[in-house]
Regions:
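Short linear recognition/processing motifs and adjacent strand/loop elements at protein termini
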Residues: 5, 11-13, 25-28, 37-320, ...
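A short beta-strand segment in extracellular, disulfide-stabilized domains
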Residues: 15-19
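Solvent-exposed, polar/charged alpha-helical surfaces in well-ordered, non-transmembrane soluble domains
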Residues: 142-148, 339-347, 351, 355, ...
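Extracytoplasmic/secreted cell-surface and envelope-processing proteins
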Residues: 160-162, 250-252, 308, 328-332, ...
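Solvent-exposed loop/turn segments at secondary-structure junctions
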Residues: 182, 325-328, 365-370, 392-397, ...
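Active-site histidine-acidic residue metal-binding/catalytic motifs
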Residues: 301-386, 396-399, 403-405
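Active-site-adjacent mobile loop/cap segments within catalytic or ligand-binding domains
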Residues: 386-389, 396, 408-411, 437-498
Length: 498
């Protein structure tokens, strides 16, 4: 049995999948009296009612003309929600219970300092993530520098974590994990108490400089005081940079330079307690970095690479290939591990890219685990021109695998959509599976901003036929070839726009 494991808690009460391998395709299988399909390699996948509370187990009976075998698989099922009313009686003593959405206020003016996550290596990619609301599943909207000072106004527990409400300026609130405040701001004896300065930081913007180079354009914004909170938003041919909690409208000075083929103009609009910069481009945004260095906020706009030969669009470019996992990862019915399968695809893709003249950066070439947050950092440090993370998909409990399967490509930033669309089209052509689209998803490896970054879910490793295909060099090669075609299509489109 691959899934579920003995005594595993299921998270649904109606129907769920069960899969594993009989070791031979020459057998029939019934689970709890229901016939379950068996593939030629012995893998099986069933979509069955969840066992009742009174008999929480799967009874498997497999057999052919010569032998039979039985297996009892105990599982745990979630309890039935208690809908019994319990109205208080006269004379009952009731203890006040805070409402689940209660926000505990922080009294007075307390300004706290953000730090990088406790597990982070010191690197410019390491930021504190701020959300519009507390809890998991919320939008990751702001990516704030370590050392940013903000006002703490409230706290709340959500999704099992402690969150702090902070003001980016007087008109904008957001939420950060309590663990991402610097240690001196957190009371060790009173978890909901915060300590910090009582006076707001003063941030003044100086004269802005524009410093173009061959590969990027730096917009250098001198600021007195600590780094400001900021927000970056992309347009079709523009980037908006909003700095919170700053005063004085900046004066922009253009460095002596010839007409720039990529940067059209930079403008600034002062608003109460903030300044908005409009960066207008002659082409779509390709990549950028926000940097805090030497008392200045530097916004680095990356130029698209110049394609010397449109017939060989990858020649001379650097491509990061990221075989997903370990740690974690899904396992198929016959125990094909996702991390092993995508490593084979990644190595084949490396060879194909090399043949096309690309420089290839591999985030891993062995089965040793690589930290999730380190993968995009490896790519940025190599100044790669694209990042592709290779995965195989699986399902959460309660999703019917016979209805919901196919090929999917994911992105985080809008600049990555064209690469995602081109790669998804090639995957559909090569792998021949259902189109699950090119979609936004909050995935860590695709949150790097310096280059287009995507994650591919080529097939479902837990489906017997797709797992069997992924064991073959032919299908692995098809997966790799699809990504190559997507990259070629994307960079060819950049060549046309030069």
């Amino acid at each position: 049995m691959t899934y579920p494991k003995p005594d595993q808690m299921l998270t649904v009460r109606d129907s769920n999948f069960i899969f594993g391998s009989l070791g031979t395709g020459d057998a029939a299988l019934r689970i709890n009296g229901i016939s379950v399909p068996v593939w030629p390699n012995g893998a099986f996948m069933g979509w069955l009612p969840v066992p009742p509370d009174s008999a929480p187990r799967y009874e498997l009976l497999a057999g052919n003309s010569t032998a039979t075998a039985r297996l009892t698989l105990p599982v745990r099922v979630p309890p039935v929600p208690d809908t019994t009313r319990r109205d208080p009686l006269v004379g009952d003593t009731l203890n006040p219970v805070p409402a689940p959405d209660t926000i505990l206020p922080v009294p007075g003016n307390v300004y706290v300092t953000l730090g990088a996550p406790a597990s982070a290596v010191n690197d410019t990619d390491r930021v504190t993530i701020a959300r519009p609301a507390p809890g998991n599943g919320q939008e990751y909207k702001w990516f704030l520098f370590p050392g940013t000072v903000v006002k703490a106004t409230g706290s709340k527990k959500a999704s099992g974590d402690d969150f702090v409400r902070v003001e980016l300026d007087s008109a904008q609130e957001s939420w950060v994990l309590r663990s991402e405040l610097q240690a001196q701001n957190i009371s060790s004896t009173a978890p909901q108490t915060f300590t910090g300065d009582s006076i707001a930081p003063v941030r003044r913007v100086g004269t802005v400089r524009i410093e173009p180079t061959a590969e990027w354009i730096d917009i250098v914004i001198p600021i007195t005081g600590p780094p400001p909170p900021y927000l970056v938003e992309e347009g079709e041919r523009s980037i908006s940079l909003l700095l919170y909690g700053v005063t004085e409208a900046p004066v922009i000075s253009m460095m002596p330079q010839p007409a720039d083929s990529y940067l059209n103009s930079v403008s600034s609009t002062p608003e109460p307690t903030r300044v908005r910069f409009g960066i207008n481009l002659n082409r779509a945004p390709y990549g950028y970095l926000a940097l805090w260095q030497n008392g200045a906020f530097t916004f680095r706009v990356r130029r698209p690479p110049r394609i010397a030969d449109p017939a060989a669009p990858l020649r001379g470019l650097t491509i990061t290939v990221d075989p997903g996992h370990p740690p974690a990862g899904a396992t198929g019915p016959t125990m094909l591990y996702e991390g092993d399968a995508v490593l084979e695809v990644g190595m084949k893709l490396r060879d194909l890219l090399t043949e096309k003249g690309a420089n290839v950066v591999m985030t891993r070439t062995t089965s040793d685990p690589v930290d999730l947050g380190l993968r995009p950092i490896i790519s940025r440090r190599a100044s790669a021109h694209a990042f592709v993370s290779i995965h195989l998909n699986a399902f959460p409990d309660g999703v019917n695998p016979f209805v919901n399967n196919g090929t999917l490509t994911l992105y985080f930033w809008p600049q990555s959509i064209p690469l995602g669309v081109a790669t998804q089209a090639a995957l559909l052509s090569e792998l021949g599976l259902r189109d699950n689209g090119t979609k936004f998803q909050n995935i860590a490896v695709a949150r790097g901003t310096w280059m287009p970054s995507i994650l591919t879910e080529g097939a479902f490793v837990i489906l017997p036929d797709q797992e069997a295909a992924m064991r073959t060099p032919t299908y692995q090669e098809a997966y790799a070839r699809a990504i190559l075609r997507g990259l070629e299509s994307y960079f060819t489109s950049l060549a046309r726009a030069q």
